Amino acid sequence: MHAYVYKSQRKQDTFVYLATRDDFSGLPAAVQAQLAPFTFVLDVALTPERRLAQADAATVREALGKHGFYLQLPKTIVLAGECDYD
């Protein structure tokens, strides 16, 4: 299975994987409104051996098969000074 990866121009470190190149029709309108425009960055073969930097390839394949897209959001980093330990 192939995935076509697009980077959001509005949200840093946010990517959309599509099952079909340039086919954003399955992406919910609310997601498109918040993240578009997108820039194409990568065409990747999602083989069982494939390792992705921020996502599990099997999870991405499953989402592409069910929904036609996978949304990769940035990981949140919490600094020790921002934590409430009470």
From Swiss-Prot:
PROSITE patterns found in the cross-reference section: YCGL
Regions that span the bilayer: none
Entry superkingdom: Bacteria
Ranges where the YcgL domain occurs: 1-83
One matching Pfam family: YcgL
Annotated InterPro entries: YcgL-like_sf, YcgL_dom
UniProt name for this protein: YcgL domain-containing protein XAC4085
Native source species: Xanthomonas axonopodis pv. citri (strain 306)
